[in-house]
């Protein structure tokens, strides 16, 4: 479970039966929660090696770099692991917005349906499909 590295104890993330771990992206300055996604080992390794957030899309069944299409990258400054080692936080600098709907955070709606954020971009313009 743990690997020793000098004076540090390296943590081995516990991926679920599908090889995934939930990842919360959190703004490193404001501490706002930006999004929840999933990562496999390859995504975590790429995040560590490149410094940019990578995730695994469960709906598309593929690895993806946050912002690869929109340009709204997440520069990862630190990766935190919870006490059970089965959830991760990426502390990030978010370029523009995290949510594909155009909001800074994917958590822009309250349970009663009211919107608590401001749309930062038009998704129809950013995600134009080439014909």
Swiss-Prot record:
Pathway: Amino-acid biosynthesis; L-histidine biosynthesis; L-histidine from 5-phospho-alpha-D-ribose 1-diphosphate: step 3/9. GO terms for biological process: L-histidine biosynthetic process. Zn(2+) binds at residues 83, 99, 106. Pfam families: PRA-CH (PF01502). Binds 1 Mg(2+) ion per subunit. Binds 1 zinc ion per subunit. Mg(2+) binds at residues 82, 84, 86. It is found in: Cytoplasm. InterPro entries: PRA-CH, PRib_AMP_CycHydrolase_dom, PRib_AMP_CycHydrolase_sf. Its main location: cytoplasm. Keywords: Amino-acid biosynthesis, Cytoplasm, Histidine biosynthesis, Hydrolase, Magnesium, Metal-binding, Zinc. GO terms for molecular function: magnesium ion binding; phosphoribosyl-AMP cyclohydrolase activity; zinc ion binding. GO terms for cellular component: cytoplasm. It catalyses: 1-(5-phospho-beta-D-ribosyl)-5'-AMP + H2O = 1-(5-phospho-beta-D-ribosyl)-5-[(5-phospho-beta-D-ribosylamino)methylideneamino]imidazole-4-carboxamide. Its EC number is 3.5.4.19. It comes from the Archaea. Its cofactor is Mg(2+); Zn(2+). Homodimer. Catalyzes the hydrolysis of the adenine ring of phosphoribosyl-AMP. Belongs to the PRA-CH family. This is Phosphoribosyl-AMP cyclohydrolase.
């Amino acid at each position: 479970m743990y690997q020793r590295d000098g004076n540090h104890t390296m943590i081995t993330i516990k991926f679920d039966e599908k090889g995934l771990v939930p990842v919360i992206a959190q703004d490193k300055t404001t501490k706002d929660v930006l999004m929840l996604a999933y990562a496999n080992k390859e995504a975590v390794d790429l995040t560590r090696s490149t410094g940019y957030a990578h995730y695994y899309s469960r709906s598309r069944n593929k690895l993806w770099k946050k912002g690869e299409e929109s340009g709204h990258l997440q520069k990862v400054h630190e990766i935190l692991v919870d006490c059970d080692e089965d959830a991760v936080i990426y502390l990030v600098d978010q370029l523009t917005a995290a949510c594909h709907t155009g909001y800074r955070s994917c958590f822009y709606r309250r349970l009663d349906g009211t919107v608590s954020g401001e749309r930062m971009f038009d998704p129809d313009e950013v995600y134009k499909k080439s014909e």
